[in-house]
Amino acid sequence: MTNLDIFLIDYEIYKANPNWWLDITEIFLKPGLIFKASFNNEHTNILEKISAYGSDLSISFEKNVLGVEGIINEEMIRDFKASYKVKNGDGIDYYSPFISLEIGENYCSAHHGSELYLSNLSEDELEKIYKIINPLDQYLKFDIS
């Protein structure tokens, strides 16, 4: 099994492929997996959306950051992909609405999508990820172990 860390080093990646983060994240979005997400507490609309998917959520609050933990379902995946868009603030692109996002045991996104930590990747997952990141290598730094 392989571990792959991906770091965004050039925000011009948006011009080459604005959906690179979602394309990688989709590989790991599977119903039944546990997710953990954190986001700024002023983004209560995110909490409202996530809460609509079920009552089996755990919600925490710490230093202006809301945390949510729950189980991914088909409706959540469909809506997440349909509503996805990159937001720009202060000259920085935010690829994820979440400060951090963990999916299952293999996926962690940090700093609004500018860092990805992928662990225990199968050959199939690694091949899919390489198809996404190889054309973008000038915008990303990656470490493999």
Protein language model features and the residues they cover:
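Structured alpha/beta or helical-core interaction and ligand-binding surfaces enriched in interleaved
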Residues: 1-145
